[in-house]
UniProtKB/Swiss-Prot annotation:
Family from the record: Belongs to the histone H2B family.
GO MF annotations, alphabetized: DNA binding; protein heterodimerization activity; structural constituent of chromatin
Organism: Bos taurus (Bovine)
Residues the record lists as PolyADP-ribosyl glutamic acid modifications: 36
Phosphothreonine found at: 116
Gene that this sequence comes from: H2BC12
Keywords recorded for this protein, A-Z: Acetylation, ADP-ribosylation, Chromosome, DNA-binding, Glycoprotein, Hydroxylation, Isopeptide bond, Methylation, Nucleosome core, Nucleus, Phosphoprotein, Ubl conjugation
Compositionally biased intervals (Low complexity): 1-12
UniProt name for this protein: Histone H2B type 1-K
Length: 126
């Protein structure tokens, strides 16, 4: 009777970095699939704001889900705006308008100013 294949140990939940180790299953090497997440960036921002504070893997999962959700909402709204204006390209203007439509009051103002600052920094570095 053949033994059931043993699953490989699960990767640590903290920071979901890319794993390049190969697993051996039935004598064949198989690479682990890469899990993309924003955990590295969330951690960097946390350390900028509160250097002495940590974050649990569950909280990191929630933050990752939140960033993905906001990204999809902004991208969807920007896509709709480009379509309404018969444009085939989403520019920073569509993103800015989408942010103004999606985020409430003061939060939208701060997001727009931070976004403008980031775009300026990026274009000046080119």
């Amino acid at each position: 009777m053949p033994e059931p294949a043993k699953s490989a140990p699960a990767p640590k939940k903290g920071s979901k970095k890319a794993v390049t180790k190969a697993q051996k299953i039935d004598g064949k090497k198989r690479k682990r699939s890469r899990k993309e997440s924003y955990s590295v960036y969330v951690y960097k921002v946390l350390k900028q704001v509160h250097p002495d504070t940590g974050i649990s893997s569950k909280a990191m999962g929630i933050m990752n889900s939140f960033v993905n959700d906001i990204f999809e909402r902004i991208a969807g709204e920007a896509s709709r705006l480009a379509h309404y204006n018969k444009r085939s390209t989403i520019t920073s203007r569509e993103i800015q308008t989408a942010v103004r439509l999606l985020l409430p009051g003061e939060l939208a103002k701060h997001a727009v100013s931070e976004g403008t600052k980031a775009v300026t920094k990026y274009t000046s570095a080119k």
